[in-house]
Amino acid sequence: MEDDIAALVVDNGSGMCKAGFAGDDAPRAVFPSIVGRPRHQGVMVGMGQKDSYVGDEAQSKRGILTLKYPIEHGIVTNWDDMEKIWHHTFYNELRVAPEEHPVLLTEAPLNPKANREKMTQIMFETFNTPAMYVAIQAVLSLYASGRTTGIVMDSGDGVTHTVPIYEGYALPHAILRLDLAGRDLTDYLMKILTERGYSFTTTAEREIVRDIKEKLCYVALDFEQEMATAASSSSLEKSYELPDGQVITIGNERFRCPEALFQPSFLGMESCGIHETTYNSIMKCDVDIRKDLYANTVLSGGTTMYPGIADRMQKEITALAPSTMKIKIIAPPERKYSVWIGGSILASLSTFQQMWISKQEYDESGPSIVHRKCF
């Protein structure tokens, strides 16, 4: 497909927005899903201060701004800010006119009906797109792995879902949601680093901790054993240089932080860990398809990028499942972007072209058309 008529694929996550053209193998634009507004009144005349900043620009000016995330736990909560993010995506990042391209958007599993209608309305009425479609994130991740049946454990910055999918259809009764994801792990790492005597408190410092988490954390295969190793030797210690040149050392925090995914009690939460949530999701499905789900457990999203997570998942699910069951955890290397990649694949299929909701259909039926055409 040529860029001039290619569909646009926009995956709006709680933490990052991924956008690009259908048919590409990676998103062209990846930026933080944040809108920043100045904390103080501007004093310099002619500075051309804006009343809001989006994405990387908001991130770089974070010292003078109040940062807001319009997507919380995977679901849009602030539509005015969301519109700003979409505007920024089309005009500043991709530099396209949205009225010339079909747009594929993604949504969280179990997204409220009113939300998808609102998305549809904004696309057609504010941005005048010729056609659009809304796809469920986890289903796209599964497509990206070349499957149509499996269970996806999708964990991003704001929310974690386990979504069983059979022959391309998500099974809503078996989808489970866990409000524990990347942002919570960053906050937890801030807390345990504070116990070490390092102080991280502001929203700007939180970004530094997020970087430490992404560069140094990993999942232990056996937590207790790893704790013992960390206590008896310094082999697990790593150092990290802060922006001001100070060097900090981090030891057992490296695996204590993501361990919270398996033991949410670390964060004071009473929910099950990701392994148990995945198992519970499978158990809510028909007994005949469970075998296919166990053998096709796909990890997706940035919070599944920790080294060691697939082996640990394999070990934990094997312990829960029937002893003869074949269990396979699929962790594609590009899983950070697999939702976007799945969208790119879907939107460029010739068989998909009749699935778009056109402007004409929208004008005839209104926003509720989205429930009839996107499932």
Curated annotation (Swiss-Prot):
Predominantly, its location class is cytoplasm
Sites where N-acetylglutamate occurs are at: 2
Q: Which GO terms of the cellular component aspect does the record hold?
A: actin cytoskeleton; cytoskeleton; dense body; focal adhesion; nucleus; plasma membrane
Q: Which reaction does it catalyse?
A: ATP + H2O = ADP + phosphate + H(+)
Tell me where in or outside the cell this protein is found. Answer: Cytoplasm, Cytoskeleton; Nucleus
Q: Does the keyword ATP-binding apply?
A: yes
- InterPro entries annotated for this entry? Actin (IPR004000), Actin/actin-like_CS (IPR020902), Actin_CS (IPR004001), ATPase_NBD (IPR043129)
- Family, per entry: Belongs to the actin family.
Protein name, UniProt field:
Actin, cytoplasmic 1
- Where does this protein come from, organism-wise? Xenopus laevis
